[in-house]
C-alpha cells in the first residue's frame, strides 16, 4: 500500500469510512478497504483427521505432509505467508523456512495453481484463506474442507480500492468508492469474492462455522515497504 501511495498516482477520496468490521485498523484516507480475510492452510477432513494446530506443528510435522504454497514475488497469499512467518518468528524466520522446506510440494505463481493441485489430491494442505471452506459449503454443498486454526494467530489480508488523481470524472469515482461500502455491494462479498465484508453485514449460512483466529497479525504499510525486498531475498536463500 505504501509503495502504491508513494507513486503519487492516487488521490485522497475524502470519504468517511464505514469499515467498522476490520480486525485491525488501517489508515484509509487514500485507499478504501472493501473486504478482508485471514490467511490459512486448508485441508480435506476426509483425508486428514488431525491437522497441525500451529505453524510450529506444521514446520515440525513428518515429511509425508505435503503443502502447496505461492511465490511471494507473484502472489498475494504467497506474500501473506512471508509476512505471517515474519510476524511469528521475526529474526528466526529464515531458519523456520529451511525447516519447512521438506513439506513444500511446490511453490506456484498464483493462488489457483496451488489450490487446484490441492483439489486434485496432490497436496495435503494449501495456503488459502479461512473463508475458502465457505465456497465448498455454499457453492458445492461439500463439508469436507476446513481451515487449520493455528495457535500463534493468523495474518490478515485487507483488499483496497482507490481513485486516480488523473480520473476524468473524480466525483463519479468518489461515488463508486462510497457505493463499495453500501449494503448492496457489501452483502455480495461473502458469496462472490469469498471474503468478509468490511461493514456490518449479515453473513450467509456456511460462514458461521469458520475458524475465528484468536490473534491477528498485520504489519504497517511502511514496515512492508521498508522490508519486503530484504524479506523476499531471505526467503529465496532459505528455499534453496
Question: Which sequence ranges carry the predicted segments?
Answer:
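Periplasmic-binding protein-like
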Residues: 23-24, 37, 65-74, 97-101, 107-108, 179-203, ...
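An extracytoplasmic/periplasmic, membrane-proximal ligand-sensing/linker region
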Residues: 93, 197-240
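A ligand-binding cleft/hinge motif common to bilobed small-molecule-binding domains
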Residues: 1-4, 119, 123-144
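Alpha-helix capping/helix-boundary segments
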Residues: 114, 132-133, 185
Amino acid at each position: 500500500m505504501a509503495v502504491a501511495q508513494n507513486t503519487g498516482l492516487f488521490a485522497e477520496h475524502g470519504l468517511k469510512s464505514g469499515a467498522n468490521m476490520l480486525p485491525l485498523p488501517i489508515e484509509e484516507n487514500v485507499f478504501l478497504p472493501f473486504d478482508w480475510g485471514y490467511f490459512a492452510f486448508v485441508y480435506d477432513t476426509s483425508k486428514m483427521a488431525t491437522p497441525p494446530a500451529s505453524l510450529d506443528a506444521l514446520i515440525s510435522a513428518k515429511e509425508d505432509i505435503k503443502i502447496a504454497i505461492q511465490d511471494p514475488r507473484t502472489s498475494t497469499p504467497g506474500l501473506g505467508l512471508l509476512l505471517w512467518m515474519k510476524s511469528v518468528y521475526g529474526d528466526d524466520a529464515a531458519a523456520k523456512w529451511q525447516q519447512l522446506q521438506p513439506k513444500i510440494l511446490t511453490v506456484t505463481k498464483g493462488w489457483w495453481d496451488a489450490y487446484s493441485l490441492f483439489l486434485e489430491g496432490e497436496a495435503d494442505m494449501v495456503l488459502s484463506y479461512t473463508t475458502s471452506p465457505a465456497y465448498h459449503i455454499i457453492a458445492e454443498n461439500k463439508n469436507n474442507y476446513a481451515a487449520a486454526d493455528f495457535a500463534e494467530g493468523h495474518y490478515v489480508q485487507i483488499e483496497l480500492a482507490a481513485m486516480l488523481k488523473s480520473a476524468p470524472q473524480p466525483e463519479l469515482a468518489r461515488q463508486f468508492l462510497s457505493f463499495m461500502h453500501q449494503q448492496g455491494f457489501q452483502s455480495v462479498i461473502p458469496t462472490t469474492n469469498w471474503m468478509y465484508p468490511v461493514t456490518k453485514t449479515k453473513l450467509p449460512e456456511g460462514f458461521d462455522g469458520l475458524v475465528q483466529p484468536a490473534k491477528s497479525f498485520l504489519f504497517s504499510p511502511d514496515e512492508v515497504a521498508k522490508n519486503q525486498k530484504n524479506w523476499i531475498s531471505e526467503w529465496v536463500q532459505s528455499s534453496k
